[in-house]
């Protein structure tokens, strides 16, 4: 009973890690669903043809995939979530297809870069493998949250004229991204978790001789 209680408390203490990483998943699904749910609005508001509509969806998907492989270093220069916010903000003010496409590419790269890095940070900063596994599984809920929020926002703005509805949806995504960036940047909790994990990592090789930790697990 005591072990179970301590485990629950430990998981609860580290839940901010899951929330911070989950926001990355939420923003990723949010931009995919946000675009698909408002693509007709963008098409009518900006006068896009069917080829341009197809390019927007296809290139966004490619940008997310490319970002997950190569976008980490690029986005880390200014912060992955802030990079996402910049891309979403460009979409908000896009006057034509080209600018909208640029915004989607930037946001897609940042979204793709954030997902694997966030999972790695959760695994690194969690106190043990069991807690890390639970935290990572918890972040998956946020993907569905992003889908839900985007659909609701798209429905609420569907009656707006021109591309205004699409701009509002992307503005909401940009605001979420800025809030997430500030939270990750300024919260002392995440700094404390990361420093504690670094201390644990530094201590592990020292106890290998006692048979407590294997170097292969470091």
List the model feature ranges, each with a label.
Residues 1-218:
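Transmembrane-helix signature of 12-pass secondary carriers
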């Amino acid at each position: 009973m005591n072990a179970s209680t301590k485990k629950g408390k430990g998981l609860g203490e580290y839940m901010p890690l899951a929330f911070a990483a989950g926001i990355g998943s939420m923003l990723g699904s949010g931009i995919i669903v946000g675009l698909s749910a408002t693509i007709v609005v963008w098409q009518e508001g900006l006068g896009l043809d069917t080829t341009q509509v197809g390019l927007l969806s296809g290139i966004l998907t490619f940008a997310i995939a490319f970002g997950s492989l190569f976008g980490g270093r690029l986005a880390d220069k200014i912060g992955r979530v802030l990079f996402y916010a910049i891309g979403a903000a460009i979409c908000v003010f896009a006057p034509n297809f080209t600018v909208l496409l640029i915004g989607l590419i930037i946001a897609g790269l940042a979204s793709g870069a954030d997902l694997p890095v966030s999972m790695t940070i959760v695994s690194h900063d969690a106190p043990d493998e069991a807690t890390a596994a639970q935290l990572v599984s918890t972040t998956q809920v946020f993907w569905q949250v992003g889908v839900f929020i985007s659909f609701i926002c798209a429905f609420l703005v569907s009656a707006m004229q021109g591309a205004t509805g699409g701009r509002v949806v992307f503005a909401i995504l940009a605001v979420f991204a800025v809030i997430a960036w500030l939270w990750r940047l300024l919260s002392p909790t995440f700094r404390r978790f990361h420093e504690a994990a670094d201390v644990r990592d530094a201590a592990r090789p020292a106890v290998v001789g006692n048979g407590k930790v294997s170097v292969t697990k470091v």
